[in-house]
From Swiss-Prot:
Belongs to the FtsK/SpoIIIE/SftA family. The chain crosses the membrane at residues 31-53, 58-80, 89-111, 131-150, 155-177. This is DNA translocase FtsK. One of its GO terms (biological process) is chromosome segregation. ATP binds at residues 484-489. The keyword ATP-binding applies. GO terms for cellular component: plasma membrane. Homohexamer. Forms a ring that surrounds DNA. Consists of an N-terminal domain, which is sufficient for the localization to the septal ring and is required for cell division, followed by a linker domain, and a C-terminal domain, which forms the translocation motor involved in chromosome segregation. The C-terminal domain can be further subdivided into alpha, beta and gamma subdomains. The alpha and beta subdomains form the DNA pump, and the gamma subdomain is a regulatory subdomain. It is found in: Cell membrane.
Amino acid sequence: MVKRNQRKKSAPKKRLTKAEVEKQRAIKRMILSVLMALLLIFAMLRLGVFGVTTYNMIRFLVGSLAYPFMFAWLIYLFCFKWLRQKDGMIAGVVIAFLGLLVEWHAFLFAMPRMLDQDIFLGTARLITRDLLALRVTEFVGGGMLGALLYKPIAFLFSNIGSYFIGFLFILLGLFLMTPWDIYDVSHFVKEAVDKLAVAYQENKEKRFIKREEHRLQAEKEALEKQAQEEEKRLAELTVDPETGEIVEDSQSQVSYDLAEDMTKEPEILAYDSHLKDDEASLFDQEDLAYAHEEIGAYDSLSALASSEDEMDMDEPVEVDFTPKTHLLYKLPTIDLFAPDKPKNQSKEKNLVRKNIKVLEDTFQSFGIDVKVERAEIGPSVTKYEIKPAVGVRVNRISNLADDLALALAAKDVRIEAPIPGKSLIGIEVPNSEIATVSFRELWEQSDANPENLLEVPLGKAVNGNARSFNLARMPHLLVAGSTGSGKSVAVNGIISSILMKARPDQVKFMMIDPKMVELSVYNDIPHLLIPVVTNPRKASKALQKVVDEMENRYELFSKIGVRNIAGYNTKVEEFNASSEQKQIPLTLIVVIVDELADLMMVASKEVEDAIIRLGQKARAAGIHMILATQRPSVDVISGLIKANVPSRMAFAVSSGTDSRTILDENGAEKLLGRGDMLFKPIDENHPVRLQGSFISDDDVERIVNFIKDQAEADYDDAFDPGEVSDNDPGFSGNGGAAEGDPLFEEAKALVLETQKASASMIQRRLSVGFNRATRLMDELEEAGVIGPAEGTKPRKVLQTN
C-alpha cells in the first residue's frame, strides 16, 4: 500500500496542450491589462496621492504629453490584436509621438526662462519640483525622453530646425498609419500634375479660341465697312443716261480688279483643330461656301516630277488627289467618354503583405531559398519579384506554378522566369478584385505623341503605367483570343484612339466584319474607304483592291524618286510651298479584319495571298493591317501569315497550344479573360502583360455620332469590291474553283508521271487543301484518267504518259 502511494506521488505531471498554454497566457495578459488600465485611470484622474504621483512619474518620462501617452496606452491594451493586423499602425503612432516630443521640447526651450539652462538638468528640475510638491503646474515639454531626442537635434540644427525635424517625424508617422505606400503617393502626385497640365492646356485653347473669335469678328466688321464704302463710292459715280454705262475712269480699274480676282488661285484653308462649329456663322455666305469648296484634281504629276529631277514619265499614274472631306473638321475630345470611376485597392495591399510571407514559406518548404524583393499591384494581377539564392536553378521555380497557386489559393499563377533585363523572377498572382481600366483614364495617363497618328494607348502594365504602341512601327498586328476575352473591345479601343487623333484626310479605314455586329457601328463615318464589308466573298476582293492600291503607290514612289509615304508627302509639301497648284498628300490606310477564321473558310487562298503580300510590302506604302480571330489554330494563322505579321496580341485562350500558335510560347492560357493580354511587339523578345482598357458601346456611339456631324462619308469607288454570287468561280472553301479547277492539268500530269493517284499525294505535291484534292480526283475520274474508288485499294491509272 505504501509502495503504491509512493508510485502515485512520483508519477510525472501531465503536459499541457498548446491550446491550454495559450489560454493561460491570455488569462495572464487580461489580468495584467486590467491592472495596468486601473493604474492609468488613477493617473489620468489624479485621484489622491497615488494618482498624482503616478501622473508625475509618467510626466517625468514623456512630459506634458502624458495624457495622449496614457490614452494611446489604454487603446493598445484592449485593441492590440486589431492593431497588429494593421501593418504600420503601431510604428506610425510611435514615430508621430516622437515627433511631438521634439516639438514640445523645442517649444519649452524657446521660452526666455529656459534659454541658458542645461537641457537635461533644466527638464529634471521642473519635473522634480512638481513631483516633490505633489502638484501638476509646470509645462515640462517632452519630459526626459523629449530631452534625450531634442539635445542632439538642437545641437545639429538649432532650436528652429528642431521644429522642422519634429514636423517631418509627424508626417512620416501619419504616412505609415495610412494604407498608402510611396507608389500611391507618386501616382497621386503624377495624376495631380497631369490634371493641372490638362487644365492649363484647356484654358490655353479657350483663350486662343476667344482671340480667334475677336479677330474674325474684327475682320468681318472691316469687310462690311469696306463693302459699304465701295457701295457708297459706286453710288456716286456718273452713269450715261443713254447707254447706262459708267463714264468715269474708274470703270477700267473695277473691271481689272474683278478679272484679277477671278484668275487668282484658290487658297487652301489651314486646318485648325480649335475651330468650333458655331464659328461658321462668323464667315460670310460666300466665304463659307468657298471654304467648303473641294479642291480640283491635279491630273498630271509632271510638274512635281520636273521640280525634283525633271524625270520622264512613260505612263501617267492615275492618282486621285481630290480631298474627300471638308477642311473644316474638329477632332473629338476626351469629354465624349464616360468619366473614370474611383478605385480602391487598399484590400490588395493588405493581402500582398500576407502573400509575401506565404511565398517565402512555400519555397522554403521545397528547399528553395528565395527572397521577395518587391511587389507591384496592377489593375488585375500583382507581380511579386523574387530573387533566388546563388545556385538555385530557374526551372525549379518555374515548375512550382501549380503548388504556388495552391498555397496562395489563387485561380492561376503565371511565372516569368526571368524578368527581361533583371536578375529576378516574376510571379503574377490574380487580384481578389479586378480594377477596370477605362478608355478615358488610359488616354489621359498615356504620353502618346499627337503627331503620331497611329500611336495608340493599349493598356496598363503591372506597375500601373500606361503603355502605348505605334502601329506604323509594328507594322501589322495580330489579335487572337477566345470568345469573351476582350478582343473586340481592344479593337474598338484602337479604332477610337485613331479617330481621336486623325482627320479623314489623314487616315482611312477598310473594315471587314463577317459577324456583321462588331464594326457596323462605324458605317457612314468619313474615315471609311467603303462601307463595312460583311460578305466574306466580297472581303477577299476588297483585300485585293488594297493590294492594287499598294502597287499603284509603289509605282508612284518609283517615278517620283522616294522610298516611302513619308518621303512622298514631304515632296508634296515642298511642291505646294513653291507652286500655286496644290496637291493632296497620300493618306494612311488601316485594314481591320474582325474575324479572320470566317474568311479563311470561304476563300483561304485569296485571303492568305492578299494578307501575305500586304504584310511583306505595305508598310512603306502607308498601309497597315489589324487581323483579329477567336480561333487561333494553324489552319487560320498559317506560318506565312505569322512571318509577315510580327506583332501579336494574345488574350485568354484555352490551351498552351493556342498560346504557342499566337506568341510562339506559353502564357496566354494563364490569363484571366477579363481584358488582360500578352502583347508582343516587333521590337521585344518577350511578351508584356497588360490590362486592356474598357470602352462601352455608348462611348463608341458618342464618338461616331460626333464624327458623323463633322463630315459625311464619301466612299472611294476604286476600293468597291462589286457584287459577288455564291456561284462565282474563284471562291470555294479552300480557295479552288467551283468548276474546271485550274490545277487540273497539273494534277493530271502528276498522276500520269507517277502512275499513282491519291488525294493525299495531290494535296502534298500541289499544296492544296483536302477538299480541293478530292474534287481534283473526281475530275480526273470523270475525264477517264483514273478509275473509280475500290475501297481501301489504290485507284487504277487508266492512261499512260
